[in-house]
Design a protein with these regions (language model features):
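Penicillin-recognizing serine hydrolase domain
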Residues: 31-36, 136-261
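Active-site-adjacent loops and short helices of periplasmic peptidoglycan-processing enzymes
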Residues: 23-177, 186-190
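Intrinsically disordered, low-complexity sequence elements enriched in Ser/Thr/Gly/Pro
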Residues: 1-2, 56
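Sec-dependent N-terminal signal peptides of Gram-positive bacterial secreted proteins and lipoproteins
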Residues: 2-24
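Hydrophobic alpha-helical segments, especially transmembrane helices
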Residues: 3-5, 66, 242, 258
């Protein structure tokens, strides 16, 4: 089995990584890192390759959606055939927030699988909120409670979510190490890694005014798409999730395999 490096490039400047605290001194690096919090793990052995402020609280921005994916996947049995209607009341909640959006529209009828792709590939806050509203039976706060319950179940020690998308809130935080625990679990779920490694996602709404009309979405992850930024593209990287806003800075969770490691 090839050994996988698990760089969670999180919390400020891009091109750093994260992982668990125990044994963090196992490896030394000969370059300076600039991210505020980092954890890098070998997934085959759970060996810590490097860590920096891995237990410090940080806002995770859209890497929050990894937990949103987990909760949705565990609450909905049939992702491909469960359909959700997008309502004006839900999407209007994001007006004026500067959100990243997938472009879903009022009265679209989409499958949960389509919404998960819309959430993870272009980092659509709109898709995240629609899913949370649907599973929470009109109350996204009920969905957020499920997110926090799952974080505790996974052993997260310093994580608290207040929304399903990652917009700024002083009480919305996690750590590099907790985000590692969350992502490692997400990678065990069906569809997660395949969805997160896409550079493009094309779909057609199953119902609504634009039913059958094709739409194509583009990843926000510059590590995996050479067309976005050749200088940041890293051909050994796979997925997973970007995030950014003024308070969080630039966040990234990713994996990479090179030379058998």
């Amino acid at each position: 089995m090839k050994k996988k490096l698990f760089p969670i490039l999180c919390f400020f400047l891009v091109l750093c990584c994260m992982l668990p605290q125990a044994g963090a001194a196992t490896f030394n690096i000969d370059f300076e890192t600039y991210s505020a919090a980092i954890e890098l793990v070998n997934l085959d052995t759970d060996t810590i390759v490097y860590e920096k402020n891995a237990t410090a609280r940080r806002e995770p921005a859209s890497t929050t959606k990894i937990m949103t994916f987990i909760v949705v996947s565990e609450q909905i049995q049939d992702l491909d055939n469960t359909q959700v209607t997008v309502t004006k009341e839900v999407v209007d909640q994001l007006l004026g927030t500067g959100s990243s959006l997938s472009g879903i529209k009022e009265n679209d009828v989409l499958t949960v699988m389509q919404l998960l792709n819309c959430m993870m590939v272009p980092s659509g806050n709109d898709a995240a909120l629609v899913l949370a509203d649907y599973i929470g039976n009109g109350d996204s706060n009920a969905f957020v409670e499920l997110m926090n319950e799952k974080a505790q179940e996974l052993g997260c020690q310093d994580t608290h979510f207040t929304n399903p998308h990652g917009l700024h809130d002083d009480e919305h935080y996690t750590t590099a190490h907790d985000l590692y625990l969350i992502t490692k679990y997400a990678m065990s779920l069906p569809h997660f890694t395949d969805i997160c490694d896409q550079t493009r996602y094309t779909y057609t709404p199953v119902g609504g005014p634009e039913a059958g009309q094709q739409r194509t979405l583009v990843t926000t992850n510059r590590l995996i798409d050479p067309n976005l930024d050749p200088d940041l593209y890293y051909r050994y990287a796979r997925g997973i999730k970007t995030g950014s806003h003024d308070q969080a800075g630039y966040c990234l969770v990713s994996t990479a395999t090179r030379g058998g490691y």
